[in-house]
């Protein structure tokens, strides 16, 4: 009889409360979709894994360690699902680790990151728009994405375009570490005459970036910078992983996963 496992691979977070609301919620939804699979968790951030071990005594595997254990425990069918937003460095690292095990299981599949196909962009735009407050006159929403120097950073301007294309003219996409930056967006917010800006994280978890870089009290936080520019600012500290529609998308990606053997 075959042994089946579900391995959910996330960047990770050291904020335990928001982890349960986001990564934990996605994991629970995936487990419901694969009831005959034993659940396993892995993080790709070595820094977060180290912090959890030293602070809480909690042990979380990297994908390689989790797969090694599954192989040694005799599992034959493994479904992997990443909770990464873009097909960036962390996803590349995940694939490189999975490829080492492509011949160790009868089946080893991986579901795509959140934003992979055109349909993904359209669906995420609608979900992200519906989950935030209804806008009044002279109000806008600014989502903060992580950003990257990986070519997959193109995801963020593409997402901004998708919002506008679908009619969400008052929703903007920025990044902390990529393009477009806040400096690129502020002039347009001023030109359009917005008075109030809702800030929200375009990240699975409302963790360190959301709490500090977005909503923090330091003068270089997005909240403080926008306030200094004359905007009223309200922060919405909810990660994308809290949205049921996003959880459902990850389940669909897992159900339609690609065999790791087929990946380059």
Role assignments for model-derived ranges:
Residues 1-264:
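Active-site-proximal alpha-helix that buttresses catalytic centers in soluble enzyme cores
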């Amino acid at each position: 009889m075959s042994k089946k496992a579900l391995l959910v691979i996330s960047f990770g977070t050291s904020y335990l409360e928001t982890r349960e609301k986001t990564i934990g919620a996605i994991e629970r939804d995936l487990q419901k979709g694969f009831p005959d699979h034993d659940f396993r968790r892995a993080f790709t951030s070595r820094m977060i894994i180290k912090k959890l071990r030293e602070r809480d005594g909690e042990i979380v595997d990297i994908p390689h360690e989790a797969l090694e254990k599954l192989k040694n425990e005799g599992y034959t069918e493994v479904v992997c699902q990443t909770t990464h937003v873009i097909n960036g460095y962390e996803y590349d690292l995940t694939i490189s680790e999975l490829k080492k095990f492509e011949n160790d299981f009868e089946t080893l599949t991986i579901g795509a990151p959140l934003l992979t196909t055109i349909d993904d962009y359209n669906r995420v735009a609608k979900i992200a728009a519906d989950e935030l407050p209804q806008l009044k006159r002279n109000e806008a929403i600014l989502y903060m994405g992580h950003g990257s120097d990986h070519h997959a950073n193109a995801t963020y301007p593409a997402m901004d375009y998708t919002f506008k294309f679908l009619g969400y003219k008052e929703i903007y996409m920025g990044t902390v570490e990529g393009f477009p930056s806040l400096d690129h967006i502020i002039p347009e917010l001023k030109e359009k005459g917005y008075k109030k800006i809702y800030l929200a994280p375009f990240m699975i978890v409302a963790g360190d970036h959301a709490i500090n870089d977005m909503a923090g009290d330091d003068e270089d936080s997005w909240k403080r910078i926008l306030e200094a520019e004359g905007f009223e600012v309200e922060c919405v500290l909810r990660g994308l992983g809290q949205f049921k529609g996003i959880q459902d998308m990850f389940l669909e990606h897992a159900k339609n996963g690609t065999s790791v053997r087929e990946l380059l």
